[in-house]
Amino acid sequence: MSRSAAWMFRRAPRRSSFNILVSTLLAATVLAGCAMSPPSGGQGSAPYAPRVVRVVAGENVWGSIAAQIGGAHAAVTSIIASPQTDPHAYEPTAADARRLADAQVAVMNGVGYDPWMNRLLAAAGGSRTVLDVGELVGVAPGGNPHLWYSPGYVAQFTRAIANAMARVDPADRAYFLRRQAHFDNVALASYNEVIARIRARYAGRPVGGSESVVVYLCGALGLHLVTPPTFLRAVTQGTDVSAADKVTIDAQIRNRAIDVYLENVQNSTPDVQAQVAAARAAHIPVVAMSETLRPAGATFQAWQTAQLRALASALETTHA
């Protein structure tokens, strides 16, 4: 496998059904957009100034942040919003196409994670601000796409989404920037505190993982992820894992060479399930991680902080 393809996902949406879907919707969407257009002015009519920015995010991890920063001056919709949805294999719906065609700001994860967003944007036509998080943070296609597990990337996104909404609604620029500062310094306070605490107490401790979703987080926490990278990539891609990697991981678990096992519960293969069972049998704590908000109505910071606290508790247990 070439290095550039190392993180590419395992299933692509079915283009034929998607193209049929979009072709049947575009004319209706354009007409609907015309019907929603503001008055053109004239005697007795007030000049139109957009005060609610329409934002569509591919994933609710980014949509949650956008909604909190946008506040009363943003209407944010997330396409993938259910913990039961596999983001890697998602296929857009008619409603997704309509929402994106009407959006003033579109947010996509990029890095090959949501290629269906590119097709929706191409079909939507019109003009809008598109915020590709992968491009924003400098992770090229073929890199690890689980960007929301990097605190540094999250910080870059909060600034970018505030500025994107301010470009659409410049009259409320100060409002968006105030809310961004509040999100960074207040809403994320517990999240940042737990990250700092884990790093201070447990940096360098060995952990295992089921999939590449844990890579950025382990780096931020200073934890030593000892699972073979080739295994993490294979599970992410949905390709066969090597026998050598399975032997290595089985030995790590059997010898209690890891303090915690981090499981991506949205991509749990038979190999991963066997490792989880073995870890529990060896009294190694298993901590659940996910790719979308859990529960679905949680905020980004509540979801991440809950996972981090579970990890901190597991690490404390192994060092009691």
Language-model segments: which ranges?
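Bacterial N-terminal signal peptides
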Residues: 13, 19-33
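Short, low-complexity intrinsically disordered segments enriched in A/P/G/S/L with frequent Arg
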Residues: 15-16, 46
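Extracytoplasmic metal-acquisition and chelation regions
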Residues: 23, 34-320
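N-terminal secretory signal peptides that target proteins for export/translocation
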Residues: 1-15
